[in-house]
A protein has these predicted regions:
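Acidic (Asp/Glu-rich) sequence patches and key acidic residues
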Residues: 1-114
Length: 114
């Protein structure tokens, strides 16, 4: 089943914003234990997916403190991001994080296939 969350990040997050986002992610890791698997390796990123042992994984969700600056192709909109979750259980964690970030950063636009 196709189901995707979308967002536009037009700028880098400030230190204050990023600290709030990371704090919320710590909360999500706690309440979604067994649903999401944290794959974060760098302090300036949040990376997670669903639990592959339960076949609850799909595309990995990645949020970066610093926006991407190098295009992969000429017409690429560097602000545009998406994560296909196929409505698997970790979709709630993805959407929660996007809604939280949108609340913290009003210029962070979000939408989904719903």
């Amino acid at each position: 089943m196709g189901y995707t969350n979308y967002w536009h990040q037009h700028r880098d997050f400030t230190k204050i914003e990023w600290d709030q986002i990371k704090e919320e992610y710590d909360y999500i890791k706690e309440v979604c234990e067994g649903v999401i698997v944290d794959e974060t390796k760098k302090a300036d990123q949040i990376v997670f997916n669903g639990d592959s042992k339960k076949d609850h994984h799909h595309e990995t969700f990645v949020i970066r403190k610093i926006v991407k600056t190098k295009k992969d192709y000429k017409e690429q909109d560097l602000s545009f991001n998406f994560c296909k979750t196929a409505m698997k259980p970790y979709d709630l964690a993805v959407w929660h994080m996007l809604c939280f970030i949108n609340r913290v950063c009003s210029d962070f636009a979000i939408s989904r296939d719903r």
